[in-house]
Amino acid sequence: MTILKNRIEYDVNKEYDLACGLHGSKFNSLHEAYAVLKEEQEEAKLESDVLNYECEKLWSLIKSDAESDIIEGTLENIYRKAILGACELVQTAAMAKKALKKI
């Protein structure tokens, strides 16, 4: 887990650098920081909610002995949503780091 955490921190720092290059290194206010953080958090939650739905769907499909291609499609959705959720959380962490520069 330590190696993965280090890789994620690296990605957060890269995302932070990218955001600073595009939008400046500081927020104009803590209100702006909150708004951006809240948006990223909501996007992460949306991905998590869909992921949860797909996992529940997978379990229902398994219990009903669904066709393997249907199960495969659901697993592909789970994979995609997990990746997208991780991306949103990386962006959330990067924006939290940027907000720390305002304090």
Where are the language model's segments positioned?
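Flexible "arm" and connector segments at domain edges
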Residues: 1-103
